[in-house]
From Swiss-Prot:
Name listed for the protein in its UniProt record: ATP synthase subunit alpha
Topology within the bilayer: Peripheral membrane protein
Name of the gene this protein is made from: atpA
Cross-referenced HAMAP family: ATP_synth_alpha_bact
Binding annotation for ATP: 171-178
Keyword Ion transport attributed: yes
Site (Required for activity): 382
Length: 526
């Protein structure tokens, strides 16, 4: 029996077998490490790499391409330099530096790459957003008009902050800058504001202390802490604020409110200077690179109040595809950058840069701090350029003259040191000023609801505290607010709901205060 080979049968068998064959080969664009050290790697090859693209080095070390030169790529390493050596192969990832975002991030401590560092397991998120993104254009924004209450009397009365504003907290070391930011985060409880605290170049123990404080006051449930401590590589400290802005933008663009604290941007500028000098970029003033202003301006411009018109918001520039279906209007991102000055020098390079970018500054002074005035805010040079339109009517009414009264008090106080014979009017003005200074003092981690602030500042500016002994002002405040809460809660509720201080409410408040002052003075006779 002869066997005949049929060509069509052979070709059909081959087709079937070839159809089941899958090529296992994967093509990567790779380069070679030429030189490595101080958190910087020079890589040969990678001719198609993009600026800001993530690179994969051996031993699970990630890096980012920053300098695209003619014959090599300057990359910063996000891990230990000693794990990378000359001749190692570097892979392109074709992914721009990005972090995972979502509600699952709340209550967690992460590094600037979005990896959890609190030992509570992995974070389940569906969306990744790029670290770098252009700020929303003018037509997608709305002017700041809603208040962001800090719970601090001195700030909410004289330097009000609105949702979508950038307000700088500036001062020497150990003047309470972080305390102001943490109090603001604690005060957002129940107000629908998601908070992001970015720790840049702080000690690990300081970050742990902040996390413990936020947990103690139940603030971690709506807060994410992004930490790049002093022991982390400089490139991680440089990208940390961008990670915070990206997470905040997720809440902003989905129609919610977010607050991001950058603590502090001086250390980010130092980290960026270190990276730039190692990459051989030309130095400028104080050895900072020429684009250090742009580093901070492109970061802080991302804080914005977004238009309520959802159709306009959906057309926002640079909107990542992952967010397009989730966009809602009316969201906001408020930024509180922190800057540390040296010996109160606000005219140094980085402080003046950030002052000119932000919408105002809260200046904290060591002299005031050491004299017992806390928060140690220098009202004279602190300002909020857009917050006035966000302040509630009641506060605007009672605190209208507060700044002027305090300025006059400071001036008279300086003059009164020269002579003892003061006329009645001057003495009365000094006495009232001293009481106003006293009522603006506040303990740490005890933010005050705005309606209580209105009540106590009303008493101070109306002169109802003029006869109360200065030593007992704090005690008076405590007992008076306690009385309002227990017996006259309807007054506080009315101020809180309407946001205004009606004439009848003011009259009732005055009446209660006059009676209480008499009782209090009788009880606390020296």
């Amino acid at each position: 029996m002869s066997t005949t080979v049929r060509p069509d049968e052979v070709s059909s068998i081959l087709r079937k077998q070839l159809a089941g064959f899958e090529s296992e080969a994967e093509v990567y664009d790779v380069g070679t490490v030429l030189q490595v050290g101080d958190g910087i790697a020079r890589v040969y090859g990678l001719s198609k790499v993009a600026a800001g693209e993530l690179l994969e080095f051996p031993n699970n070390v990630m890096g980012m391409a920053l300098n695209l030169e003619e014959d090599n790529v300057g990359a910063v390493l996000f891990g230990e330099s000693n794990l990378v050596k000359e001749g190692d192969t570097v892979k392109r990832t074709s992914i721009l530096a990005s972090i995972p975002v979502g509600e699952a991030m709340l209550g967690r401590v992460i590094n600037p790459l979005g990896e959890p560092i609190d030992g509570k397991g992995t974070i389940d998120t569906q969306i990744r957003l790029p670290l770098e993104r252009r700020a929303p254009g003018v037509i997608y924004r709305k002017s700041v008009h809603e208040p962001l209450q800090t719970g601090l009397k001195a700030i909410d009365s004289m330097i009000p902050i609105g949702r979508g504003q950038r307000e700088l907290i500036i001062g020497d070391r150990q003047t309470g800058k972080t305390a102001v930011a943490i109090d603001t985060i604690i005060n957002q409880k129940g107000k629908g504001v998601f908070c992001i605290y970015v720790a840049i170049g702080l000690k690990g123990s300081t970050v742990a202390q902040v996390v413990n404080t936020l947990e103690k006051y139940d603030a971690m449930e709506y807060t994410t802490v992004i930490s790049a401590t002093a022991s982390d590589p400089a490139p991680l400290q440089f990208i940390a604020p961008f990670a915070g802005a990206t997470l905040g933008e997720y809440f902003r663009d989905t129609g919610r409110h977010a607050l991001v604290v950058y603590d502090d941007l001086s250390k980010q500028a130092v980290a960026y200077r270190q990276v730039s000098l190692l990459l051989r970029r030309p130095p400028g003033r104080e050895a900072y690179p020429g684009d250090v202003f742009y580093l901070h301006s492109r970061l802080l411009e991302r804080a914005a109040k977004i238009t309520d018109d959802i159709e306009v918001a959906r057309k926002m520039n640079d909107l990542p595809d992952a967010l397009k279906s989730l966009v809602k209007g009316g969201g906001s991102l408020t930024a509180l950058p922190v800057i540390e000055t040296q010996a109160g020098d606000v005219s140094a390079y980085i402080p003046t840069n950030v002052i000119s970018i932000t919408d105002g500054q809260i200046f904290l002074e060591s002299n005031l701090f050491n004299s017992g005035q806390r928060p140690a805010i220098n009202v004279g040079i602190s300002v909020s350029r857009v917050g006035g339109s966000a302040q509630i009517k009641a506060m605007k009414k009672v605190a209208g003259t507060l700044r002027l009264d305090l300025a006059q008090f400071r001036e008279l106080e300086a003059f009164s040191k020269f002579g003892s014979d003061l006329d009645k009017t001057t003495k009365a003005q000094l006495d009232r000023g001293a009481r106003l200074v006293e009522i603006l003092k506040q303990g740490q981690y005890i933010p005050m609801p705005v309606e209580k602030q209105v009540a106590i500042i009303f008493l101070g500016t109306q002169g109802l505290l003029d006869t109360v002994d200065l030593r007992f002002i704090r005690k008076f405040e405590e007992e008076f607010l306690s009385l309002l809460e227990i017996k006259h809660n309807d007054l506080l509720a009315k101020i809180a709901s309407s946001g205004a201080l009606e004439a009848d409410t003011a009259a009732k408040l005055k009446d209660i205060a006059v009676k209480f002052v008499t009782v209090f003075k009788e009880k606390n006779k020296a």
